[in-house]
Swiss-Prot record:
Pathway: Amino-acid biosynthesis; L-tryptophan biosynthesis; L-tryptophan from chorismate: step 3/5. Belongs to the TrpF family. This is N-(5'-phosphoribosyl)anthranilate isomerase. It is an enzyme of class 5 (isomerase). The lineage of its organism: Bacteria, Pseudomonadati, Pseudomonadota, Gammaproteobacteria, Pseudomonadales. The gene is trpF. It comes from Pseudomonas aeruginosa (strain UCBPP-PA14). GO terms for biological process: L-tryptophan biosynthetic process.
């Protein structure tokens, strides 16, 4: 299988972004949602993005942000990709001069394929754990057997991933990418460099085992 891309989300410090890049992560995520313990402001986000080495993708995570708020952030922070985690419609996600991912939470009984089809312009679909009232970062995994065989878009797997279970997740789901936040933290918003390395190694070793 092709190399599974890896995103380390909830980055709040330059040193954590650099540690993620050094470990081999393909992307880092910055949370622009004030209610999150991993939220960053524009100044900190710009500092982190400017410190990234070449070819590491910067992703901005938003939850029901207004166009005005989005515009202010995008004018100040050179993000490569947007990730929408709220109740945004397709038209809310488009027109920002950036490709985007739409996160869908795996609520039991939902038609995930149908919901994904409502975002034809999305670069990919991220599947996360459903917890009532929580848009993401729950730290809980969902039943991977519920993931459809074909979403019609690149699939990003999130929700409760850790260095201990991500290898099994990659083997079972075969996603385009995996996204982790709490599973590689020392505390909320502070990454553990050793756990980041272990997570990346677990993903890469699973691919080597299959070649």
């Amino acid at each position: 299988m092709p190399a599974v891309r890896i995103k380390i989300c909830g980055i709040t410090r330059v040193e954590d972004a650099l540690a993620a890049a050094a470990a081999g992560a393909d992307a880092i995520g910055l949370v622009f949602y004030a209610k999150s313990p991993r939220a960053v402001d524009i100044h900190r986000a710009r500092e982190i993005v400017r410190a990234l080495p070449p070819f590491v993708t910067s992703v901005g995570l938003f939850v029901n942000a207004s166009r005005c708020e989005l515009g202010e952030i995008l004018d100040a922070v050179p993000l490569d990709l947007l990730q929408f985690h709220g109740d945004e419609r397709a038209e809310d996600c488009e027109g920002h001069r950036r490709p985007y991912l739409k996160a869908l939470r795996m609520k039991p009984g939902d038609d995930i394929v149908g919901r994904a089809a409502a975002y034809p312009g999305a670069a990919g679909i991220l599947l996360d754990t459903y917890v009532e009232g929580v848009p993401g970062g729950t730290g809980a995994a969902f039943d991977w057997s519920l993931v459809p065989a074909d979403l019609g878009k690149p699939l990003v797997l999130a929700g409760g991933l850790t260095p201990d279970n991500v290898g099994r997740a990659v083997e079972q789901v075969k996603p385009y990418a995996v996204d982790v936040s709490g599973g590689v933290e020392a505390s909320k918003g502070i990454k553990d460099a050793a756990r980041v390395r272990a997570f990346v190694d677990a993903v890469r070793s699973r691919r080597r085992d299959e070649t």
